[in-house]
């Protein structure tokens, strides 16, 4: 069969939009639960109403996250399914991964090394995202730990309200 002549071809207009095909939609709410990223104990609890003592810094201040004890090299697991939004390095919390878990909620994991995820990657709950590493100088007296922060629309939320009881 001969190829159609240009005059016989139909014009097709494609809108200037990127359509995400088969991209999961994540949902998180006040009724959702989070898996513990590591098995350790809480070293420094969440408190935005009162100050708590930070041994290394020798100061009292609010804490927008929880700091969970860990062993160096221990796998750090994703607490919920989501998409990796950002990977960055912070003087206080070291290498960190921010994961959007849906409906304006984000989880930040800090004090990581040997990351196993990349930006824009979709991850399931329980997936290894990295490994606990020696703490930054801001947490040297607290020891090796994982910094674990939950945000809703950019504001810190107490992750203990969502973590599944051990």
Regions found by a protein language model. Name each.
Residues 69, 114-117:
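Short alpha-helix capping/helix-loop boundary micro-motifs
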Residues 78-113:
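Zn2+-dependent peptidoglycan hydrolase active-site motif and core
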């Amino acid at each position: 069969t001969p190829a159609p002549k240009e005059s016989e071809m139909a014009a097709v207009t494609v809108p200037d939009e990127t359509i995400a095909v088969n991209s999961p939609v994540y949902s998180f709410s006040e009724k959702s639960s989070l898996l513990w990223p590591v098995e350790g104990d809480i070293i420094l609890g969440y408190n935005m109403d009162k100050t708590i003592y930070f041994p290394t810094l020798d100061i009292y201040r609010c804490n927008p996250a929880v700091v969970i004890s860990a062993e160096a090299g221990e796998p750090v697991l994703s607490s919920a399914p989501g998409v990796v939004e950002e990977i960055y390095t912070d003087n206080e919390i070291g290498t960190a991964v921010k994961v959007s878990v849906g409906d304006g909620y984000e989880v930040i994991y800090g004090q990581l090394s040997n990351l196993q995820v990349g930006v824009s990657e979709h991850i399931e709950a329980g997936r290894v995202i990295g490994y606990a590493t020696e703490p930054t100088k801001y947490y040297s007296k607290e020891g090796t730990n994982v910094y674990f922060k939950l945000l809703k629309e950019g504001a810190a939320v107490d992750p203990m309200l969502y973590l599944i009881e051990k």
